[in-house]
Amino acid sequence: MIFDMLPNKIKKEPSKMATMVWPDFGKSFELNEFYRLYESCGGEIGKAYIFFWSTKEIVEFEPLRSELYPSAWRIFASDGGGSYFGFSDEDGKPHFFSCDPIDPTGSVYWLGEWQEFIRRLSKAEYF
């Protein structure tokens, strides 16, 4: 499964498994599938650490995200040391990135689609 490499996954209660965080991308979008099954996760992937925020944390961050970040950006995770992870839906396909929370548009690193994002994250090639 595509989430096997993600550490310390917290499974959702079966009654909450229908959540689609980003409905515009549909059920096949990797993060919608992740959040359908899991509440969050965190730990090392290769040389990097990542913490996938819970759906509650994503919703709570939304007002700040909409104020500080481009409207097409969605933030869903951090590395615990100064980088946020998100994706942009500017062209109808999700492209993942990392950015500095203090200067997000001045420090964005584009990391590709899901498989490339995970590969680059595992090698700590995201800043």
Enumerate the language-model features and the residues they cover:
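Compact, glycine/acidic-enriched structural inserts
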Residues: 100-127
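Intrinsically disordered, low-complexity regulatory segments enriched in Ser/Thr/Pro
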Residues: 92-102
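A surface-exposed partner-binding patch
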Residues: 1-86, 126
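Short acidic-glycine loop/turn motifs at beta-strand connectors
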Residues: 87-91
